[in-house]
């Protein structure tokens, strides 16, 4: 992926304001609520029977933070995203058997969460840069599948 200087600035500038715990928890919770079939990968998390249960589930919150913390590695390594996610791609493919389409869905959900949290600061140019980033991360995570 080739990044313009402006794209890098938009991504890193916004990332510096992101509350990883809150945004990560919200993104994973939204994924599980909006796309309920993704819950099958989180059976060990206990009660995911309703939106209220998902939103209040401490395991969802903790894993959401872990996911978004990992996403931060992409922000730090914009020019080497494929290698940054090589091990996670292998884990999700070989051991967890996650449908790679779910990575794209989570990326789209993250865009919604960022827009909700940052409003006007999440300008169309900023959204375009972040959309490019979430696509690159989803592609890197799906790499082991091909």
Swiss-Prot record:
Keywords: Heme, Iron, Metal-binding, Oxygen transport, Transport
Pfam family, one: Globin
Protein origin, superkingdom: Eukaryota
Cellular component, GO annotation: blood microparticle; haptoglobin-hemoglobin complex; hemoglobin complex
InterPro entries: Globin, Globin-like_sf, Globin/Proto, Hemoglobin_b, Hemoglobin_oxygen_transport
CDD domains in the record: Hb-beta-like
Keyword Secreted attributed: no
Tissue expression notes: Red blood cells.
Biological function: Involved in oxygen transport from the lung to the various peripheral tissues.
PANTHER family: HEMOGLOBIN FAMILY MEMBER (PTHR11442), HEMOGLOBIN SUBUNIT EPSILON (PTHR11442:SF7)
Subunit text: Heterotetramer of two alpha chains and two beta chains.
Family listed: Belongs to the globin family.
Record protein name field: Hemoglobin subunit beta
Gene: HBB
């Amino acid at each position: 992926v080739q990044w313009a200087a402006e794209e890098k600035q938009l991504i890193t500038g916004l990332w510096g304001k992101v509350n990883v715990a809150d945004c990560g928890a919200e993104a994973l919770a939204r994924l599980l609520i909006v796309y309920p079939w993704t819950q099958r990968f989180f059976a060990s998390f206990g009660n995911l029977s309703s939106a209220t249960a998902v939103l209040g589930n401490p395991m969802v919150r903790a894993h959401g933070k872990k996911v978004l913390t990992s996403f931060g590695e992409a922000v730090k390594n914009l020019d080497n995203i494929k290698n940054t996610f090589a091990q996670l791609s292998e884990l999700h493919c070989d051991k967890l058997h996650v449908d790679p389409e779910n990575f794209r869905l989570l990326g789209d959900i993250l865009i919604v969460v960022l827009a909700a949290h940052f409003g006007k600061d999440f300008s169309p140019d900023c959204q375009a840069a972040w959309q490019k980033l979430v696509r690159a991360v989803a592609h890197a995570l799906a790499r082991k599948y091909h």
